[in-house]
Amino acid sequence: MATFKLIVVSAEQHIFNGEVKGIQATGSEGELGILAGHLPLLTAIKPGIIKITLEDDTEEVIYISGGFLEVQPTIVTVLADVAIRGKELDRERILEAKRKAEQNIVSGAKDANYEMLVSKLSRELAKLRAYELTDRLTQRKR
């Protein structure tokens, strides 16, 4: 299967730079599957995960807080606000942040608006999904 170059960068650092067989992400209009030879595309990406299929058919997961995805003939670039490899996520920290976000929504915290609270919860759920998918992929390798 043909490959293409994928670059994933966040505001702080380069997260990924290498040849891949494909990626899956959530764009502003829905789910995207990108393989070599995909038509050029520029789209906003929603908070969630990017699932990468590497040259050796192993998979890697990266949490993205949002950003942009650009497809060119031989290169795909993801510009993310925040990007964290699934293997670098801390489950306990995510669960604690999720619990606090849920608690703030239920209690109607007066210092934040509802949309911000729901957005925070959504980001924590996406991180948890990235962590769990990475964990499953790691167990499958064993």
Curated annotation (Swiss-Prot):
SUPFAM superfamilies: Epsilon subunit of F1F0-ATP synthase C-terminal domain, Epsilon subunit of F1F0-ATP synthase N-terminal domain. It is found in: Cell inner membrane. GO terms for molecular function: ATP binding; proton-transporting ATP synthase activity, rotational mechanism. Gene3D superfamilies: ATP synthase delta/epsilon subunit, C-terminal domain, F0F1 ATP synthase delta/epsilon subunit, N-terminal. Keywords: ATP synthesis, Cell inner membrane, Cell membrane, CF(1), Hydrogen ion transport, Ion transport, Membrane, Transport. Its main location: membrane. It is a peripheral membrane protein. Pfam families: ATP-synt_DE_N (PF02823). The keyword Cell inner membrane applies. GO terms for cellular component: plasma membrane; proton-transporting ATP synthase complex. It comes from the Bacteria. Belongs to the ATPase epsilon chain family. Produces ATP from ADP in the presence of a proton gradient across the membrane. F-type ATPases have 2 components, CF(1) - the catalytic core - and CF(0) - the membrane proton channel. CF(1) has five subunits: alpha(3), beta(3), gamma(1), delta(1), epsilon(1). CF(0) has three main subunits: a, b and c. This is ATP synthase epsilon chain. It comes from Histophilus somni (strain 129Pt).
